[in-house]
């Protein structure tokens, strides 16, 4: 079963992206994505949607 999660910028804290992941995975998602507020690519970490 997949759950919806938000990806939050590690620098400014904006929730810029929403995606899904498997519920049975223990580790959280951490992706390098573009942040429009910071105007650069930053690490985005998983948070509750």
Curated annotation (Swiss-Prot):
NCBIfam families: PRK00504.1, PRK00595.1, rpmG_bact
Keyword Ribonucleoprotein: yes
Keyword tags: Ribonucleoprotein, Ribosomal protein
Lineage: Bacteria, Thermotogati, Thermotogota, Thermotogae, Thermotogales
A biological process term (GO) from this entry: translation
Classification via Pfam families: Ribosomal_L33
Family from the record: Belongs to the bacterial ribosomal protein bL33 family.
Organism of provenance: Thermosipho melanesiensis (strain DSM 12029 / CIP 104789 / BI429)
MF-aspect GO terms: structural constituent of ribosome
GO cellular component: cytoplasm; ribonucleoprotein complex; ribosome
Keyword Ribonucleoprotein part of the UniProt annotation: yes
Protein's name according to its UniProt entry: Large ribosomal subunit protein bL33
């Amino acid at each position: 079963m997949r759950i919806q999660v938000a990806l939050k910028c590690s620098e400014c804290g904006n929730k810029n992206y929403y995606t899904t992941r498997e519920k049975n995975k223990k580790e959280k998602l951490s992706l390098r994505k573009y942040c429009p507020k910071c105007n650069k690519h930053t690490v985005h970490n998983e948070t509750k949607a």
